[in-house]
Amino acid sequence: FKNKFRYYLNSILSKINFSYNLSMLFQLLILTILILTLLTALIYPPNTPDSLSYHMSKVMHWIQNGNVEFYSTAITRQLYLSPFSEFVILHLQLLTNGDYLANLVQWFSMIGCMITVSLINKEFGGNNKSQLFSALFCATIPMGILQSTSTQTDYVVSLWIIILAYFIVRYKTTKSIKYIYAFAVALGLALITKQTAYIYALPFCVWFLFLTLKRPDHFLLLFTIPIIISLINFGQFKRNFELYGNPIGIHS
């Protein structure tokens, strides 16, 4: 009986395309997470203490004042912290006359992270199934699921840092100069999104520096990186310097 059972079981299993079914399972799980988080982001308005006291309050002050200059407030982090995510929310707020789409900034950033992680996997030789698994791993990070339905900035800055890492990998593979400029833009956007990028981007900057040391002609182009970063962050650097005397604000 055991031999017959084993025979029939092996016959059934041999007819199942596990590779195909596993890929379908990964896609189904990713789609389920995206749909559930999208519905949550659309149905529920921004309601975390951080959203109400910082992110959305900053946006409403800008709308009320008609500009993004600093204003009088007891919550000074509304001023000196990097404002990129809130700039995007500001546009959505004005276009829809409400906060209906405010949570989608982080939700789309989650999708961007999933795509970029899968592309990095591909650069290291991953096949379609491993790329899907990478995207699924990214989508199932518990804090990521919570962040994807809020107006916080962690997923947005994560997106820029992951893109930055992808450009480093592409530069290592192709040695193309365009990835030096792409790296600079991604780094500048990360810094204008959240100031923790100064810490988390540092190891990638060191890695990129070592890669360019192997190409003296490319190494000289590194001097364009701080210029690009300064251009992207100029407005916030200027406002912080005028009020606090330094470009990154009160805690420097």
Across the structure, where does each feature detected by a protein language model lie?
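Membrane-interface alpha helices of multi-pass inner-membrane proteins
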Residues: S134, I168, Y179-Q195, P203-C205, ...
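Short acidic/glycine- and proline-prone juxtamembrane loop motifs at membrane-interface regions
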Residues: I75, L146-V156
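Start-transfer (signal-anchor) and selected internal transmembrane alpha helices
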Residues: F1-L38, L220-I228
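Membrane-interface transmembrane helices that cradle and orient dolichyl/undecaprenyl
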Residues: L164-Y179, F210, K214
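Membrane-lumen/periplasm interface segments of specific transmembrane helices
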Residues: Y44, F210, L220-S252
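Transmembrane-helix signature of polytopic, membrane-embedded enzymes
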Residues: Y100-L101, V117-P142, L159, T173-K175
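Transmembrane-helix motifs of polytopic, lipid-linked glycan transferases
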Residues: L34, L101-G125, I163
